[in-house]
Amino acid sequence: MKKFLSLVLALTMMMSLVTINAGAKEFTDDEELNYKEAVDVISEISVVDGYEDGSFKPQNTLTRGAAAKIICNLILGPTTAAELHADTAPYKDVPVSNTFSGYIAYCAKEGIISGYADGSFRPAGTLTGYAF
């Protein structure tokens, strides 16, 4: 619970420093965004960057691996988070070649996230709002 509250506090502090300008990323599916201002804020500070095709896809589910990346971007900032890497596989189903392995390894080391009893993490598994 302490780590979660620390994460919320860090996010609150970061967002209080942000001003949105005309340079906020425009997603190809902006008209589908119910919370466009919030999406503008988190994309402006590079917490999320959308998909390669330029869309945000608000209807898609969030995977456990992508959640680890978002958490690292919030805590470390996107530049430092992008430099994270895993020297060894953090979980039996997360090889070092996995896109999210560095983020998952960092979050696991810091006690922010955990895997399953069988030693897996299931990075492609989806999260509910409650779990995140």
Question: What is the predicted function of each stretch?
Answer:
Residues 2-36, 49-102, 110-130:
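Feature responds to low-complexity, polar/acidic, surface-exposed segments characteristic
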Residues 40-47:
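Mature N-terminal segment immediately following signal peptide/propeptide cleavage
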